[in-house]
């Protein structure tokens, strides 16, 4: 009988880690869990990333485990081992494990999860960097030598030559895979990616002491943290489908002088300027409820967030990032703004780094190359501020996976200096290990510095490039009033919808506006099927969908309401 105590909000990975120590196996990937005694069920690590509560485990539920033995005699207990998880209200969740069997030896491999399409494409590519024949070559046209042979996508000299500060995510993945896994021996597969974890284990696998803070040992405390600038980036480039998208967003500051925040909706595509690169293509900026000020803003509850996400998903789009303005007029009356963010101040403030990390944690990158099915995030942060010459320019960033882990463990917080992050003290159940940051000095030597009480935010930043396409082909038009701009006099109401649709030439082209689509959904006039017709027409541009829509009772009702509102 096994008894494992975890909080209801704890990741199921904590249960598995202790379970593995009690079974005759060290391989989490060989464990399968089912709620039926005669069913193999799901691979256990596919449940990681979700809490015990999210998985729906209740007191008395039985779970059955199947695993591969690593050589030790299998357990032959007639009684079922029992795992209990303690919830926040003190109740125990019983997880009974019976009928443990040894399945046929099956080679492990990557997880079966739904990755983004761009990851599926790049997984199939090696990304080798082709080189032409050089003057140093001493062979014929069909020969190859060290001076012209292809380079791997993670080659440091190539990155230095091209001025790439970071390698791409898939180049990083391939580099680790190359050293960890043998292509000719699939049975020895090891997941190449692993997220850093700076949390103390409140359920020590040794079982020799009470949970922290009443007890602690080397098996449950996190190791010393050494921060250094991340060598790879999850996304290499941010591309706005049309400059109008960004200009319309900045217009709110130009009109009112208050700052603005928006969520970037788009998709991820291959970026051919970087080996195995990824770019975020932004098709729309949705502005959630907020209260803007001259030097900041306050985000308000966003009640229809799920509805907006569902509309975007129906169009093949999803959240790819966030953007906000930090603009101050220079006073020169020539349209220039102050340059506040530069190498001698900061690029993202400490509070913005924390916000970016929280958004990245909320929007994880799903991957088959990690035991947990997750690794970091592709969520980007774009700040619109003043350039060195007083121009308005966007700059795109991400924070490192170490920043995400620091946030999860509640180790960092903001400080009075925007360029510095403060390290919290150990308190209650929060344990903060020693933290250092590492950098290369002017002599090329690595120097470690104690990060307490504060350290520069630059050690958590990853910079991205951004641009507009030379030949734009955006999915949407930006003509309907943007949401939550009532303070500017831009209203999304029946009158504005009537005027907007009245300009339609009759081909449904006015439907190609993300803000109008979210407004239609918010009114609730169209039925679910009728709204699906609208979104299907916008995505596929099939006139059959449009003809069915205009003849539907919901659309006719919508038009009648608009006509009567004028």
Swiss-Prot record:
Keywords: Cytoplasm, Endoplasmic reticulum, Membrane, mRNA transport, Nucleus, Protein transport, Translocation, Transport. Involved in the import of nuclear-targeted proteins into the nucleus and the export of poly(A) RNA out of the nucleus. Has a role in the endoplasmic reticulum-associated degradation (ERAD) pathway. This is Nuclear protein localization protein 4. It is a peripheral membrane protein. Belongs to the NPL4 family. One of its GO terms (molecular function) is ubiquitin binding. Its main location: cytoplasm. GO terms for cellular component: endoplasmic reticulum membrane; nuclear membrane; perinuclear region of cytoplasm. It holds the Pfam family NPL4. Residues 238-375 form the MPN domain. One of its GO terms (biological process) is ubiquitin-dependent protein catabolic process. It is found in: Cytoplasm, Perinuclear region; Endoplasmic reticulum membrane; Nucleus membrane. It comes from the Eukaryota. It comes from Debaryomyces hansenii (strain ATCC 36239 / CBS 767 / BCRC 21394 / JCM 1990 / NBRC 0083 / IGC 2968). PROSITE patterns: MPN.
């Amino acid at each position: 009988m096994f008894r494992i105590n975890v909080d209801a909000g704890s990741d199921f990975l904590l249960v598995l880690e202790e379970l593995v120590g009690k079974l005759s196996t060290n391989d989490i990937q060989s464990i399968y869990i089912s709620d039926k005694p005669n069913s193999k069920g799901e691979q256990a690590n596919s449940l990681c990333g979700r809490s015990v509560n999210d998985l729906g485990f209740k007191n008395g539920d039985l779970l059955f485990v199947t695993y591969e033995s690593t050589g030790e005699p299998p357990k032959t207990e007639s009684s079922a081992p029992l795992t209990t998880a303690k919830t926040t209200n003190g109740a125990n969740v019983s997880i009974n494990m019976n009928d443990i069997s040894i399945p046929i030896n099956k080679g492990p491999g990557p997880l079966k999860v739904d990755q983004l399409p761009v990851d599926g494409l790049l997984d199939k590519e090696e990304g080798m960097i082709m080189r032409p024949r050089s003057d140093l070559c001493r062979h014929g046209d069909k020969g190859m030598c060290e001076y012209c042979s292809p380079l791997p996508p993670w080659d440091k000299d190539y990155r230095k030559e091209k001025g790439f500060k970071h390698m791409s995510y898939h180049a990083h993945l391939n580099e680790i895979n190359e050293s960890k896994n043998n292509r000719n021996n699939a049975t020895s597969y090891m997941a190449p990616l692993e997220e850093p974890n700076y949390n103390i284990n409140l359920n020590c696998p040794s079982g020799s002491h009470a949970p922290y803070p009443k007890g602690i040992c080397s098996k449950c405390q996190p190791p010393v943290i050494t921060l250094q600038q991340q060598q790879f980036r999850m996304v290499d480039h941010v591309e706005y489908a049309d400059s109008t998208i960004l200009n319309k967003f900045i217009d709110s500051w130009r009109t009112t002088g208050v700052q603005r925040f928006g969520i970037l909706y788009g998709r991820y595509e291959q970026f051919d300027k970087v080996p195995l690169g990824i770019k975020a293509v932004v098709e729309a900026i949705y502005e959630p409820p907020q209260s803007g000020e001259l030097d900041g803003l306050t985000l308000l509850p966003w009640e229809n967030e799920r509805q907006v996400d569902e509309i975007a998903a129906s169009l093949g789009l999803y959240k790819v990032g966030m953007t906000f303005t930090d603009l101050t007029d220079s006073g020169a009356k020539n349209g220039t703004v102050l340059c506040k963010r530069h190498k001698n101040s900061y690029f993202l403030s400490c509070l913005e780094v924390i916000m970016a990390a929280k958004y990245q944690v909320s929007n994880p990158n799903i991957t088959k190359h990690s035991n947990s099915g997750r690794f970091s995030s592709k969520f980007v942060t774009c700040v619109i501020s003043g350039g060195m010459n007083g121009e308005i320019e966007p700059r795109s960033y991400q924070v490192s996976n170490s920043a995400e882990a620091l946030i999860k463990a509640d180790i960092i917080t903001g400080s009075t200096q925007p360029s510095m992050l403060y390290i919290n003290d150990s308190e209650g159940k929060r344990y903060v290990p020693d933290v250092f940051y590492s950098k290369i000095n002017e002599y090329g030597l690595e120097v470690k510095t104690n990060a307490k009480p504060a350290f520069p935010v630059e050690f958590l930043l990853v910079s991205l490039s951004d641009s507009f396409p030379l030949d734009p082909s955006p999915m949407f038009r930006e003509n309907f009033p943007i949401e939550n701009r009532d303070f500017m006099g831009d209203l999304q109401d029946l009158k504005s919808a009537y005027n907007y649709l009245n300009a339609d030439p009759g081909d449904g082209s006015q439907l190609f506006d993300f803000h109008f689509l979210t407004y239609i959904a918010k009114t609730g006039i169209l039925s679910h099927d009728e709204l699906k017709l609208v979104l299907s027409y916008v995505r596929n541009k099939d006139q059959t969908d449009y003809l069915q829509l205009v003849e539907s009772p919901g659309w006719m009702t919508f038009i009648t309401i608009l006509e009567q509102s004028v």
